[in-house]
Amino acid sequence: MTEFGMPTLVELPSLEENARLAAALGLKFVESNMNLPMYQAHRLTRERLAPRNGVYFTLHLDEGLNPFDFNPLVREAYLQTAEHTVRLAAESGVPCVNLHMPEGVHFKLPGRKVYLFDEYREEYRASLLAFRERMARAADGRVTVLVENTCFTRLRGLPEALDTLLESPAFALTYDAGHDACDGFAAAEFYRAREGRVKHVHLHQANETTCHLPLGGGRVDENDWLARAENGGMRVVIEVKSREGLERSVNALRERNAIA
C-alpha cells in the first residue's frame, strides 16, 4: 500500500500540529521543509523527529542549497549543512532527505543563456563526486538522499549529473509531477527509464505557469503516478501548500480509493 504524506504547512507553526493534521487526514508522514526557520537542522533533535500519532517525518533540504558552488568556502557551508542533516536523519530514524537539484548561475548572451555548470563541466563533476561521497558516508546505509527534478529544460548536463549521483546506492530519485508539468514534462522520460530508482513522488496539479495546485484534475496524470507509486513502493507527498488545498486533495484521492 502506498504511503501518503504532506509537507509542513506555513499555516501550522510546529511539527506537532502538522503531525496531528496528518493523522486526522489518514496520512503516514510529514515532510519537513528546512527553508522554514523552526525546521533548521540545529533546531531539530531526535526527540522532535520521533514518530507521533502514527505519523513519521521525512526532511526536505533548503531549496537554495547548492553543494556544487564554485566558491569552495560557500560550497563547504552547503556540504556541511547537508551532511549534518543526513546524519541527523540517520540518528533519528528518518528514512529520506530530499534535495532540489540546483541549476546554478547562468549568463544571458544574445539569443541564449549559458549555464555555468554546463560550461565548466570538470569543476561541476568534481563537486558532484565529492557530494556523493560525503552524503553516502553520512547516510551510513540508513538514509536515502533523494534528488528532485527542477531544471530539466535549462541544464543540459543534468541527466548525466543525476546518473553520477545514482552510481551510489545512497541516492535515489524524487519525481515532482507538478514541476515537470510546468517544464513541459521534460523529465518524465528520464524518470520512467529509471523507475526502479524513483522512491518518492511529489504529487500536485499544475497549469502552464503555476504548480502546487490541489489534486482532482489538471495537466498532471495523477492516476499514472499513483499506479507507479503503488507498483514501485514509492512514498507520495501531496505537495500542496495550504490546509484547504490539502484537504481537497485527500478527498479527491479518497473518491478514487487511492487512499484509505
Enumerate the language-model features and the residues they cover:
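N-terminal pre-domain/capping segments
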Residues: 1-90, 172, 259-260
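Histidine-acidic metal/acid-base catalytic patches
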Residues: 1-3, 12-24, 83-95, 99, ...
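Conserved residues at beta->alpha junctions
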Residues: 9, 149, 240
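Active-site flanking residues adjacent to catalytic metal/cofactor-binding acidic residues
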Residues: 30, 59, 147-148, 175-176, ...
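Short, glycine/acidic-enriched loop or turn micro-motifs at the edges of active sites
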Residues: 34, 63, 151-152, 179, ...
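Alpha-helix-loop-beta-strand connector modules within alpha/beta enzyme cores
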Residues: 47-64, 126-138, 168, 223-228
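Short, histidine-centered active-site or binding-site loop motifs used for metal coordination
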Residues: 61-65, 103, 205-207
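Active-site acidic/histidine proton-transfer and metal-coordination neighborhood
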Residues: 71-172
